[in-house]
Swiss-Prot record:
Mg(2+) 1 binds at residue 91. InterPro entries: Isoprenoid_synthase_dom_sf, Terpene_cyclase-like_2. Its EC number is 4.2.3.-, 4.2.3.88. (2E,6E)-farnesyl diphosphate binds at residues 316-317. The keyword DNA repair does not apply. Its cofactor is Mg(2+). It comes from Piloderma croceum (strain F 1598). Pfam families: Terpene_syn_C_2. SUPFAM superfamilies: Terpenoid synthases. This is Sesquiterpene synthase PILCRDRAFT_825684.
């Protein structure tokens, strides 16, 4: 029998995110892309088969960096591209691992970041130490500390996610939102916002409720839209339990389109939350809030808008139908997903 299929209609995020200025593509894209691709090729050849490497080319993660960070200088942009490539490779690898294997990988990452003399001979260790030395060692002390702390939390959360996946456990909405913020690695990419802008916010700014409100809104916007765009591939791999669409369907007892519509409405509210946080901080007298923190929130707007643009410019989520889906907003949900590729293929 042919596979059953259904369709969903995606929200028009372009309209929602039009409140954020479109600052276009970073002018250093071409040069930094070639350098970053050469760098990640040293590592993904160790674990990726030829088909997965071709898929990676079509995803064009370097384009993501150029859209997320349009203001970065060439060195900063290179760092963002390297990080996005690194995170993709780590995510694809751990998607196929058991909880024990994912926890072991997390241990390697943590040791590579925190112990200068650690070297277990693995490609993961080599990649992390190389990235840290090239980029994070040059960041401000607050940013560098947060980056290492956030990276260790991220890989630990990925290990926990592998355990939830094995048990087919679906979290409630509140728990999922907090958990997704950690498994998304967005704290790392947001740390690079400060690195690229040459701003090293003190921790008390991060702890400020208004800044935290804007920060969390930006994180959730990217998390929820990515979940929505990746749902088709994840359900095909049997990983849909760790996706906000599935979480909403279960928690609210609704069908898939109602869950998608809920995501769209919630993203409108999150957009307003980010804009409001910027407005409040702009009115403060202290420069660290009215200038530096505001600039960071504005850059988060670049990230949110750039993420939506890249999702349809790349074949990451919708394959060769990306441009058709962008126009029609219609996604056909099919199991099994015909062009799904294993990392070692």
């Amino acid at each position: 029998m042919p596979s059953q299929s259904l369709t969903i209609r995606l929200p028009k995020f372009e309209e929602t995110f039009s409140v954020f200025p479109d600052n276009g593509l970073n002018p250093h894209y071409a040069n930094s892309r070639a350098e970053s691709r050469a760098w990640i090729n040293q590592y993904h050849h160790a674990v990726c088969g030829p088909n997965m490497r071709t898929f990676m080319d079509k995803c064009n993660f370097e384009l993501a960096g150029a859209l997320f960070y349009p203001y970065a200088n060439e060195a900063g942009l290179r760092a963002t591209m390297d990080l996005v490539n690194l995170l993709w490779l780590y995510d694809e690898l751990t998607d196929t691992k058991t909880e024990t294997e994912a926890v072991n990988a997390a241990h390697i990452v943590a040791c590579a970041l925190r112990e200068p003399d650690f070297d277990d001979g693995t490609w993961i260790c080599s990649m992390i130490k190389d990235f840290n030395q090239r980029h994070i060692s040059k960041a401000g002390p607050n940013t560098a500390y947060r980056f290492i702390y956030n990276f260790c939390n991220y890989v630990e959360a990925v290990g926990t996610e592998a355990g939830l996946r094995a048990k087919n456990e679906i979290l409630d909405i509140t728990t999922y939102i907090s958990f997704r913020r950690e498994t998304s690695a967005l704290r790392l990419t947001f740390d690079l916002v400060q690195y690229c802008l040459g701003i090293d916010l003190p921790q008390y700014v991060h702890d400020d409720p208004v800044f935290a409100s804007g920060y969390n809104a930006a994180m959730d916007l990217v998390c929820w839209t990515n979940d929505l765009f990746s749902y088709n591939r994840e359900q095909a791999k049997g990983h849909a339990g760790a996706n906000v669409v599935t979480v909403i369907m279960k928690s609210k007892g609704v069908d898939i389109q109602s869950a998608v519509d809920f995501v769209g409405g919630y993203c409108e509210a999150l957009t307003s939350q980010l804009v409001e946080a910027r407005r409040i901080l702009l009115s403060r007298s202290h420069r660290v809030y009215s200038k530096d923190a505001v600039r960071i929130l504005e850059a988060f707007g670049d990230f949110v808008r750039g993420n939506d643009q890249w999702s349809f410019a790349s074949e990451r989520y919708f394959g060769q139908k990306n441009k058709v889906v962008k126009e029609s907003r219609i996604v056909e949900i099919i199991t099994p997903f015909s062009d799904l590729i294993a990392i070692n293929e």
